[in-house]
Structures are given as C-alpha cells and as structure tokens.
Swiss-Prot record:
The modification 3-methylthioaspartic acid is found at residue 102. One of its GO terms (molecular function) is rRNA binding. It comes from the Bacteria. GO terms for biological process: translation. This is Small ribosomal subunit protein uS12. Keywords: Methylation, Ribonucleoprotein, Ribosomal protein, RNA-binding, rRNA-binding, tRNA-binding. With S4 and S5 plays an important role in translational accuracy. The lineage of its organism: Bacteria, Bacillati, Bacillota, Bacilli, Bacillales. Pfam families: Ribosom_S12_S23.
Length: 137
C-alpha cells in the first residue's frame, strides 16, 4: 500500500483501453512495406473464403462467415449477418467492427448493402442494419 506522499509524487496510472477491433486501426504503406496508424470506422476487403461455422457450447447453428483480406493486407474472419447472402470468393466487401459472441475468432461484421454485398430480401423491420431498401406499397 503506497503512502500519500508516494501517490503525490507518482499518481496511479489508469489502464489504457485496448481496441475491440484492432485491425481497423492499421493502415499499410505499400511503398515502404510497413504498417501505419490509420484509424478507420470500416475497411474494404476481398473475400478469400466463404463458409459456415458452428457456434460455442450452448448454441447450435451454422453461422455464415467469410475470410476477408483487407486493404491493409491483413486477413480476418467476418460474420455475414441476415438470412441468405450473395457472397463468394473475390467479392469486394465493407467490414465494420463488432464481434459475434458465440463464434470464436470472429470480431468483425460485413456491412450488408455496400459494395458487392446485397441487402437482405424481404426484410421489413430493422432494414438499415441489413441494407434493405424501403418497400414500395
């Protein structure tokens, strides 16, 4: 236990917060072949593999995911939200942060309705998260 005098001389340091999606905070300088600090809310990438994965213990399903090589040359696993998708190898996608709690190693989401990813068909509620246009009545 430090004395008050010791705390006056050197106060307690608060822990620095680690990013939940560290890959989005890296840029890549292809001329110098080195990484740079470049924070961005989303990054563009190309699908290298599209498949399904089984979730952790209490849950049971086949969750859709894509292996994506981002514009900073890092490969990640990204979750494909919604029912049905049109992604295949070499599709260009937009990736945002946000983990999937029951899929180990999946810390990113693919943005529906952006670039090569289509929106979810027939969706009427919560459309903005799934890139669905307003239906004509």
């Amino acid at each position: 236990m430090p004395t008050i005098n010791q705390l006056v001389r050197k106060p307690r340091q608060s822990k620095s917060k680690k990013s939940d999606s560290p890959v989005l905070n890296r840029g890549f300088n292809s001329k110098k072949k080195q990484f740079t600090n470049l924070n961005s809310p989303q990054k563009r990438g190309v699908c290298t593999r599209v498949g399904t994965m089984t979730p952790r213990k209490p849950n049971s399903a086949l969750r859709k995911y894509a292996r994506v090589r981002l514009s900073n040359n890092i490969e990640i696993n990204a979750y494909i939200p919604g029912i049905g998708h049109n992604l295949q190898e070499h599709s260009v996608v937009l990736v945002r942060g946000g983990r999937v709690k029951d899929l180990p190693g999946v810390r990113y989401h693919i943005v529906r309705g952006a670039l090569d990813t289509s929106g979810v068909d027939g969706r009427r509620q919560g459309r903005s998260l799934y890139g669905t246009k307003k239906p004509k009545n």
